[in-house]
Amino acid sequence: RLMAFSTLLCIAYLVANTLLMGFSLSTILVTTFVWCAFNVSVSIQKLVVAFLPIILFVLIYDFMRVYPNYMVNPIDTKGLYDLEMQLFGFNSTNGTLIPSEYFNNNHWLITDILSGIFYLCWVPLPIVYGLYLYFTKQKRICIRFTSAFLLVNLIGFAGYYIHPAAPPWYVMQYGFVPDFSIGGHV
């Protein structure tokens, strides 16, 4: 029964994903992996259930492409920039700068490396910590931790839609007018 339910769920996800976002081999591979992991053995099934909140996070994040935040509310390019300038702006030889403008002009290798590491760890580190909790027999804490991870990210997603904002690099490079022809930037 559980296998039939998980199979139906995976097929429904693949159909919805394909209809809304187009065919993707990576989606099929990930869905197949989750289905196999869920149906291989009871012990692995328990691991998948413990990490269901993180799987939900990934699915929700993926489906956010279907209805972009700028279709819900207008993108704020100036308001948050001005607020950051008031709260964190500081004087330099180039005038008053927000921190990202300052660090854009003053690269320090160690801060660039540390920033990159912290940025890259915001998803993998909680997953590793969740696995640590799970495999050290702290399954209840693992489930609470992964659920908290999902909740915090859902709050972030809500903020992303309630008040869409341009990142500091966008304002530095393109100004305050939204231009949807510009691609992503890392």
List where the protein language model places each region.
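Membrane-interfacial catalytic/cofactor-binding modules of polytopic membrane enzymes
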Residues: A158-V186
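Small-polar-interrupted transmembrane alpha-helices in polytopic inner-membrane proteins
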Residues: S147-Y160
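Membrane-interface elements of multi-pass transporters and channels
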Residues: Y67-I75, K137-Q138, A165-Y170
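N-terminal transmembrane-helix/juxtamembrane module of multi-pass inner/ER membrane proteins
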Residues: R1-T27, V42-P126
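Structural signal for membrane-spanning alpha-helices in multi-pass inner-membrane proteins
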Residues: C36-N39, G130, Y160, P164
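Membrane-interface helix-boundary motifs at transmembrane edges
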Residues: F38-V49, Y134-R144
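Central hydrophobic cores of alpha-helical transmembrane segments in multi-pass inner-membrane proteins
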Residues: I28-V40
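Hydrophobic, aromatic-rich transmembrane alpha-helices
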Residues: P126-L133
